[in-house]
């Protein structure tokens, strides 16, 4: 028979809301949940990040505040009268993305020339971060590190920005450039792109692999509790040094990759490698990932790692209805 069917309309999708009660648990399963949380925070509605138990890594709000976001976004929510332990996510937070180039080029005398911000039109990695954070996840961006609550991105930190992070400014960095900036700021961490004695252009490598969850963490629990170990990273980098006090979050398993663009030598080094750490000690307040989280703005599967890392740095008091 004819197996082809005419498609003349997009499928209808809607939120799933079950249960009864004064509180609503928003499952942290998609980017739509992040958008819903940020929309609620923008409206001044209290949102809690659940820290433990069955709903760890999910979000809690009052049931009265759920209807608007359930209609605007496609989310999964469960109503209940039992409010799980949660911390309030700070509202009004601004995120600064580092890595912008100067507005103009300059010659050896310091004289500026060129078209204003032309080079940043070609600054793809900066654009991916900004687009992913603002447009795809709903975070508000800041024009400078000074006016931001947190610094987030794959770009190199300036000397002043790195000093702020070293002094405790919240930071989420990903990729070898970002990790190297923190190393240069004084954190005992290193990120390698080389195949040992055979340096390569491994910054162009990527892999869709499986990860081992090395420790319990609010950054990773939404994936860990659902058995979602798939993890994409562009860059091919590996954390070859980490502070003893850092919490080890993710490492690549020895399983065959689902997809990989790497030399055979690099594959063997990449397997078992450390990919993410949480540095909350001695004044540091940072989460670091060895590889990309926003590459080409298509890594939506990894965005919940990024959002959870951001939220984990900006928690306030206990959530209560």
Go through each PLM region and give its residues.
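Intrinsic-disorder/low-complexity accessory segments
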Residues: 1-321
């Amino acid at each position: 028979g004819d197996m082809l069917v005419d498609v003349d309309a997009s499928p209808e999708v809607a939120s799933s809301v079950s249960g009864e009660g004064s509180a609503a648990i928003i499952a942290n399963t998609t980017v739509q949940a992040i958008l819903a949380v940020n929309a609620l925070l923008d409206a001044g509605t209290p949102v809690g990040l659940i820290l433990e138990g069955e709903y760890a890594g999910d979000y809690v709000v009052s049931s009265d505040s759920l209807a608007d976001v359930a209609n605007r976004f496609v989310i999964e929510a469960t109503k209940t009268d039992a409010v799980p332990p949660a911390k309030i996510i700070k509202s009004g937070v601004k995120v600064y993305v580092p890595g912008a180039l100067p507005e103009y080029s300059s010659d050896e005398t310091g004289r500026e020339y060129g078209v204003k911000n032309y080079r940043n039109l070609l600054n793809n990695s900066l654009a991916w971060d900004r687009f992913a954070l603002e447009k795809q996840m709903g975070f508000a961006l800041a024009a400078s590190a000074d006016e931001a609550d947190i610094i987030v991105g794959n770009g190199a930190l300036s000397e002043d920005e790195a000093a702020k992070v070293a002094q405790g400014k919240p930071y989420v960095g990903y990729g070898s450039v970002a990790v190297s900036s923190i190393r240069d700021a004084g954190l005992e961490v290193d990120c390698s792109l080389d195949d040992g004695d055979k340096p390569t252009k491994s910054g162009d490598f990527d892999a869709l692999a499986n990860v081992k969850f090395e420790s319990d963490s609010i950054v990773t629990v939404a994936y860990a509790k659902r058995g979602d170990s798939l993890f994409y990273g562009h860059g091919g980098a590996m954390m070859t040094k980490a502070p003893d006090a850092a919490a080890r979050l993710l490492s690549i398993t020895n399983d065959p990759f689902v997809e990989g663009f790497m030399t055979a030598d690099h594959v063997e080094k990449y397997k078992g490698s450390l990919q993410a750490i949480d540095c909350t000690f001695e004044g540091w307040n940072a989460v670091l990932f060895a590889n990309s989280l926003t590459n080409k703005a298509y890594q939506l599967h990894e965005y919940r790692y990024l959002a959870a890392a951001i939220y984990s740095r900006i928690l306030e008091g206990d959530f209560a209805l």
